Amino acid sequence: MDIISSASAVVGLVFNFATAAKTCNAVRGRYKAAALTLDSIRQELETLQAALQQLANLMMHDASALTSQWDTDHSLSGTFARSMKGFERTIKGIQAELDTLKSEKEVLGRLDKAKVVWNEDGMREHLSRLRSQAGALQLLLQVLQT
């Protein structure tokens, strides 16, 4: 994956993270019991969004940002690409789940609430995946710094 493609992938993810964080905030007000989980997801998304934005800036200003002198088989750029795909799958899963909870109505009535069931375990799993992806990216970036 060349530097332009990598930076483009990161910028696309930044937008997706921002969208999902905004949706988290919108859904949070409707599901009071889910506030802590949604806050955690939103905070992770916002932190990762900022980190990925900085990574994109770095890649745009330093073409060697995704290289390492120890990468003799030239596998790091492919690993980075797979990491970005993992983030993309994770964020799409979160956004899809949040979209089912989002309603155009300001306040949900009883019937509206009955139609949608808060899935705490599923949302915690999304949060866990998001944190795992962040940990994997952090490890990869540490390798790139050597």
Regions found by a protein language model. Name each.
Residues 1-75, 79, 104, 141-145:
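N-terminal amphipathic alpha-helical segments
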Residues 45, 49-52, 56, 81-84, ...:
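A structural signal for well-ordered alpha-helices, especially hydrophobic packing surfaces
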Residues 85, 103-146:
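Regulatory helix-to-disordered linker/tail regions at the edges of structured cores
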Residues 9, 98-99, 105-108:
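A generic short-segment signal for beta-strand/edge and adjacent turn/coil regions
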